[in-house]
Amino acid sequence: MKVIFLADVKGKGKKGEIKEMPTGYAQNFLIKKNLAKEATAQAIGELRGKQKSEEKAHAELVAEAQSIKAKLAEEATLVEFTEKVGPDGRTFGSITSKKIAEELQKQFGIKIDKRHIKVDSPIRSIGLIDVPVKIYQDIAGVIRLRVKEG
């Protein structure tokens, strides 16, 4: 019996795969537990349509991520922070990924999740700093910061 997997089943198949399975195993285990459904012509058509729409959505997200990366690469995209500085040259407050995300949204209208901004430790020094950011899956960019004395 041909089945379409609705979820990953260890040793049998992954979600979205169409495979030939023993009839008893398919009916009594896979279909009852909603791990798979019978591969009828209609179900296969639905699966193909769903895969096409997922590919289209993925392509749109990649295009959006590429445009964000291009915006970040422009010379004009320099996120500025004005912080109070102590006598040792370190800022009183630290600049975290949350602050960077908020300033990027406020200054340039670029929305990036703070969890994707890779700050090893909070920034406490003044000057120009490059911070890596993961925009989408394998698309990464760099946010340029200028921290100046206020």
Swiss-Prot record:
Gene Ontology molecular-function annotations: rRNA binding; structural constituent of ribosome
InterPro entries noted in UniProt: Ribosomal_bL9, Ribosomal_bL9/RNase_H1_N, Ribosomal_bL9_bac/chp, Ribosomal_bL9_C, Ribosomal_bL9_C_sf, Ribosomal_bL9_N, Ribosomal_bL9_N_sf
NCBIfam families: L9 (TIGR00158)
Keyword Ribonucleoprotein attributed: yes
Entry keywords, A to Z: Ribonucleoprotein, Ribosomal protein, RNA-binding, rRNA-binding
GO biological process, alphabetically ordered: translation
Summary of the function given for this chain in its UniProt record: Binds to the 23S rRNA.
Organism per entry: Streptococcus sanguinis (strain SK36)
SUPFAM superfamilies the UniProt entry points to: L9 N-domain-like, Ribosomal protein L9 C-domain
Entry keyword annotation includes rRNA-binding: yes
Protein name as annotated: Large ribosomal subunit protein bL9
Family: Belongs to the bacterial ribosomal protein bL9 family.
Any one cellular-component term (Gene Ontology): ribonucleoprotein complex
